[in-house]
Protein backbone atom coordinates (compact mmCIF):
# COMPACT_ATOMS: atom_id res chain seq x y z
CA UNK A 1 0.00 0.00 0.00
CA UNK A 2 2.69 2.62 0.90
CA UNK A 3 4.34 2.03 -2.49
CA UNK A 4 1.08 2.82 -4.30
CA UNK A 5 0.61 6.01 -2.26
CA UNK A 6 4.17 7.15 -2.99
CA UNK A 7 3.66 6.33 -6.68
CA UNK A 8 0.54 8.49 -6.85
CA UNK A 9 2.38 11.23 -4.96
CA UNK A 10 5.17 11.06 -7.54
CA UNK A 11 2.63 11.34 -10.38
CA UNK A 12 1.01 14.32 -8.64
CA UNK A 13 4.31 16.19 -8.23
CA UNK A 14 5.38 15.34 -11.79
CA UNK A 15 2.07 16.59 -13.21
CA UNK A 16 2.52 19.90 -11.35
CA UNK A 17 6.26 20.41 -11.95
CA UNK A 18 6.29 19.52 -15.66
CA UNK A 19 3.81 22.24 -16.79
CA UNK A 20 5.69 24.77 -14.65
CA UNK A 21 8.92 23.86 -16.45
CA UNK A 22 7.24 24.22 -19.86
CA UNK A 23 5.85 27.64 -18.88
CA UNK A 24 9.29 28.72 -17.69
CA UNK A 25 10.91 27.56 -20.93
CA UNK A 26 8.30 29.33 -23.06
CA UNK A 27 8.82 32.55 -21.08
CA UNK A 28 12.59 32.30 -21.59
CA UNK A 29 12.10 31.79 -25.34
CA UNK A 30 9.78 34.82 -25.52
CA UNK A 31 12.39 37.09 -23.94
Curated annotation (Swiss-Prot):
Transmembrane segments: 4-26
Main location per the UniProt record: plastid
Presence of keyword Ribonucleoprotein: no
GO cellular component, one term: cytochrome b6f complex
GO process annotations (BP): photosynthesis
Keywords recorded for this protein, A-Z: Chloroplast, Electron transport, Membrane, Photosynthesis, Plastid, Thylakoid, Transmembrane, Transmembrane helix, Transport
Membrane topology category: Single-pass membrane protein
GO molecular function terms listed in the Swiss-Prot or TrEMBL record: electron transporter, transferring electrons within cytochrome b6/f complex of photosystem II activity
Highest taxon listed in the record's lineage: Eukaryota
Protein localization: Plastid, Chloroplast thylakoid membrane
InterPro entries: Cyt_b6/f_cplx_su6
Family indicated by similarity: Belongs to the PetL family.
Function field: Component of the cytochrome b6-f complex, which mediates electron transfer between photosystem II (PSII) and photosystem I (PSI), cyclic electron flow around PSI, and state transitions. PetL is important for photoautotrophic growth as well as for electron transfer efficiency and stability of the cytochrome b6-f complex.
Matches recorded under HAMAP family: Cytb6_f_PetL (MF_00433)
Subunit note: The 4 large subunits of the cytochrome b6-f complex are cytochrome b6, subunit IV (17 kDa polypeptide, PetD), cytochrome f and the Rieske protein, while the 4 small subunits are PetG, PetL, PetM and PetN. The complex functions as a dimer.
Xref: PANTHER family: CYTOCHROME B6-F COMPLEX SUBUNIT 6
Protein name per Swiss-Prot or TrEMBL: Cytochrome b6-f complex subunit 6
Organism: Nymphaea alba
Amino acid sequence: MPTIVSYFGFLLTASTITPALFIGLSKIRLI
